[in-house]
């Protein structure tokens, strides 16, 4: 218990009623400020000054020696000891602001808190925060044994390390706050006097500052560099699990992996260099003459708190994020960047990147994996399993699709080898010949039309190939998925055994490009057996709709109004105009999908009916019905005269947004050149599997109900023995260019068949005779 003689002069705390010593500016129990209402602001006697300075020195000594200031009582030094060390007034230094004479060891003015030879320090609300931060930092430093052992603290009580320096600073700031209030009243009165004494005071300050700076440098130099080096915890990170291990650990504490010497050595060198740099910085600070003890220790404390904080941050770092970054770096080193650059080239429309990948023998059918998508780091643009063709279709790269599709020319599963790929020169000649057959009707309907008719069919010579070769041919020619989907119950194709078997009119689904040009490709395949790669048919379609728009718009609008009334809703004229402009723009854009109106216009360009067999419902990826397809039916060239058109139709198939050409197989008797029949006939059903007539599209209100009679007018209709209404498709002689293309295509498979079926010729065994006669007998 602290004893004192003047218990009657103690002041009572207004918060906790604890009686504090007169020199205490804050309550020892609750840290509440001392009430200053009863103080005399003009009391500036020498006795009070000496007492104040003595009390300040005692408070500083208590702050330095006590480890926890809140747990012990502040034992003040007796005032008699302070009076014994009185110094003459000539040795005191006056404050340049308030002219108060301060003791030589005081670094700041007791009255106005002005720094000795500098400006007033900041005061305010940060005192409590600094004190609390100092306590926490002091505990952390003591826990890590940064400030040394207890014996060192006992032998060197002047060392100001960690929380003691910050706590002493907070106490001095608390004393300065109280004295600053007393100075506000007479600051203006003393300001004029201080101006006259300024030159004399500056000389005294320079003389008194030299011994003070020596004491400050000696006190700050008491902190050895060994203690500074101990502040940095140099743990090493495991390369496998990223666990932070202690420096002396040979193996990882988590996974048991041996520490790599090269990495650890580099880390130790790094920590050693950082510690040496910190020692050099401390030596430079100690050599500077104008640095006070408080600022040196505060900077020392803050620096080591930052180092400890950084080590704690390393120990508690987000290991998941580091593992992901490390995994991405490994992926970037292992993946094929030429392939990934090609994928990015399709997305970013970089033609050269795709061309560079294909020129080096890259496979256009290669699909993306999850690892490669992680390396690309663009999940919104790429999906697992996507190829360059998928990306080109998704991002509408119409100029890249022909190049990618041309690369699909090898053999193997999923690789297509259509006749136009085997004989590209002949296919180009066929497209050029077709372009020359297009004409424009000048009188009447200004519509493009073809001058010659052709119908494509698979050659009968396929039956002469071996069965394995036939299977390979069909795999590389047909679209098996579309064929299966059209024949799946309820079937839309080859559902009548009478038509397929007895009448030999089975239809095959040809593969074509999976793009928005599939309708035009299928129309060209059904007639000439090639793709519309030069967009000849698309340009003719766009020109026809623009030049004959007034004729097509009237019938299209009436048909759409009729379909809307069947679904019990109506459309406004503005909606019709908007939809019509959309249809016109789609016709002129290569790669864009086409609608029913475009099939109706194609029937006029080809001058023949078009029969579409398709699914009735559009399904999602999960197999759920999401809407009506409405493409199945008969499209007649109603704007032409019947005598101007042929009655031999072509057949197309529709499956979930994709059109395919439906072609028959030529009868085997066609190979015989002595036959009398010039044309072969294929029978196309005009009824569905439920024996209902196929709808005729774009009929007016007056024409509805006369579907069968209109079919008989525009088609060669007959009825089978089973009562099915069918249309006759005439197969005439092949055009010369088409025959040459098919012959070259068949020769490819004939060569494969010869290699497989050729007999194995064994080499004759040659007998070698020795020159020795005895060995010959043996």
Curated annotation (Swiss-Prot):
Protein known as: Ubiquitin thioesterase trabid
Phenotype on disruption: Flies are viable and fertile, suggesting functional redundancy.
Enzyme class: hydrolase
Keyword Transmembrane helix: no
Example GO BP: cytoskeleton organization
Biased composition (Polar residues): 187-197
Chain spans, region Disordered: 187-226, 265-290
Keyword list, A-Z: Hydrolase, Metal-binding, Phosphoprotein, Protease, Repeat, Thiol protease, Ubl conjugation pathway, Wnt signaling pathway, Zinc, Zinc-finger
Source organism: Drosophila melanogaster (Fruit fly)
Zn-finger region bounds: RanBP2-type: 5-36, 89-118, 232-261
Stretches with biased composition (Low complexity): 198-226, 273-288
Annotated CDD domains: OTU_ZRANB1 (cd22767)
GO terms for MF: cysteine-type deubiquitinase activity; K63-linked deubiquitinase activity; K63-linked polyubiquitin modification-dependent protein binding; zinc ion binding
Domain of life per record: Eukaryota
Domain notes from UniProt: The OTU domain mediates the deubiquitinating activity.
Post-translational modification Phosphoserine, affected residues: 770-771, 775
SMART domains attached to this UniProt entry: ZnF_RBZ
Function: Positive regulator of the Wnt signaling pathway. Specifically cleaves 'Lys-63'-linked ubiquitin chains. May act by deubiquitinating APC protein, a negative regulator of Wnt-mediated transcription. Required for an efficient wg response, but not for other signaling responses, in the eye.
Catalytic activities: Thiol-dependent hydrolysis of ester, thioester, amide, peptide and isopeptide bonds formed by the C-terminal Gly of ubiquitin (a 76-residue protein attached to proteins as an intracellular targeting signal)
């Amino acid at each position: 218990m602290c004893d004192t003689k003047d218990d009657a002069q103690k002041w009572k705390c207004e918060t906790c009623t604890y009686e504090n010593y007169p020199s205490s500016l804050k309550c020892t129990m609750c840290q509440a400020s001392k009430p200053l209402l009863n103080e005399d602001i003009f009391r500036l006697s020498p006795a009070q000054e000496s007492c104040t300075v003595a009390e300040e020195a005692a408070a500083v000594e208590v702050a330095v020696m006590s480890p926890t200031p809140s747990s012990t009582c502040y034992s003040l030094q007796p005032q008699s000891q302070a009076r014994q060390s009185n110094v003459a007034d000539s040795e005191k230094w006056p404050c340049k602001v308030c002219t108060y004479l301060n003791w030589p060891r005081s670094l700041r003015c007791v009255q106005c808190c002005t720094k000795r030879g500098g400006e007033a320090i900041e005061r305010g609300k940060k005192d409590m925060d600094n004190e609390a931060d100092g306590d926490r930092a002091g505990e952390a430093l003591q826990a890590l044994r940064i400030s040394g052992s207890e014996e060192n603290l006992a032998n060197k009580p002047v060392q100001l390390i960690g929380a003691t320096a910050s706590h002493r600073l907070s106490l001095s700031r608390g004393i300065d706050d109280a004295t600053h209030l007393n100075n506000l009243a007479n600051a203006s009165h003393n300001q004029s006097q201080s101006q006259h004494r300024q030159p004399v005071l500056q000389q005294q300050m320079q003389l008194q500052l030299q011994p003070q700076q020596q004491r400050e440098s000696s006190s700050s130099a008491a902190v050895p560099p060994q203690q500074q080096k101990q502040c940095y915890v140099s743990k090493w990170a495991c390369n496998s699990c990223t666990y932070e291990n202690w420096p002396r650990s040979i193996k990882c504490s988590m996974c048991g992996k041996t520490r790599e010497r090269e990495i650890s050595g580099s880390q130790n060198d790094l920590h050693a260099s950082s510690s040496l740099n910190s020692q050099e910085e401390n030596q430079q600070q100690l050599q500077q003459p104008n640095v006070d003890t408080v600022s040196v220790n505060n900077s020392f404390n803050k620096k080591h708190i930052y180092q400890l904080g950084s080590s704690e941050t390393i120990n508690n770092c987000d290991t998941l994020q580091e593992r992901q970054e490390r995994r991405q770096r490994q992926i970037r080193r292992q993946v094929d960047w030429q392939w990934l650059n090609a994928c990015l080239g399709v997305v970013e429309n970089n033609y050269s990147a795709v061309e560079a990948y294909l020129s080096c023998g890259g496979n256009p059918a290669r699909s993306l994996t999850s690892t490669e998508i992680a390396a690309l780091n663009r999940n919104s643009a790429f999906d697992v399993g996507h190829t360059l063709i998928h990306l080109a279709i998704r991002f509408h790269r119409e100029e890249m699709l022909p190049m990618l599709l041309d690369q699909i020319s090898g053999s193997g599963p999923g690789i297509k080898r259509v006749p136009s790929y085997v004989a590209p020169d002949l296919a180009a000649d066929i497209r050029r010949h077709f372009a020359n057959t297009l004409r424009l009707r000048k009188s009447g309907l200004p519509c493009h039309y073809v001058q010659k008719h052709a119908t494509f069919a698979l050659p009968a010579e396929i039956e002469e190939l071996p069965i394995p070769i036939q299977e390979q041919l069909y795999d590389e020619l047909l679209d098996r998925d579309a064929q299966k989907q059209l024949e799946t119950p309820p079937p839309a194709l080859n559902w009548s055994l009478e038509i397929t078997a007895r009448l030999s009119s089975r239809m095959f689904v040809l593969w074509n490009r999976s793009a928005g040009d599939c309708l035009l490709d299928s129309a060209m395949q059904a007639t000439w057996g090639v793709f519309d790669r030069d967009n000849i048919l698309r340009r003719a379609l766009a020109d026809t709709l623009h030049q004959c728009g007034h004729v097509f718009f009237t019938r299209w609008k009436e048909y759409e109004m009729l379909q809307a009334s069947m679904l019990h809703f109506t459309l406004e004229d503005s909606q019709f105009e908007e939809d019509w402009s959309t249809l016109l723009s789609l016709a002129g854009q290569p790669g864009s999908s086409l609608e029913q109106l475009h099939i109706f216009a194609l029937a006029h360009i080809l001058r023949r009916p078009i029969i579409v067999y398709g699914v009735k419902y559009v399904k999602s990826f999960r197999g759920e019905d999401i809407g009506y397809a409405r493409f199945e039916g008969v499209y007649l060239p109603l704007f032409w005269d019947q005598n101007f058109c042929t009655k031999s139709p072509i057949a197309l198939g529709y499956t979930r947004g994709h059109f395919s050409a439906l072609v028959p197989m030529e009868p085997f008797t066609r190979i015989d050149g002595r036959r009398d029949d010039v044309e072969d006939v294929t029978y196309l059903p005009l009824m569905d599997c439920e024996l209902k007539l196929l709808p005729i599209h774009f009929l007016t209100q007056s024409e509805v109900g006369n579907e069968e009679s209109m079919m008989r007018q525009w088609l060669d209709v007959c009825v089978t023995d089973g009562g099915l209404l069918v249309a006759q498709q005439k197969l005439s002689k092949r055009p010369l260019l088409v025959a040459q293309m098919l012959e070259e295509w068949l020769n490819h498979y004939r060569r494969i068949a010869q290699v497989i079926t050729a007999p194995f010729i064994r080499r004759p065994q040659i007998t070698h005779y020795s020159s020795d006669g005895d060995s010959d007998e043996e």
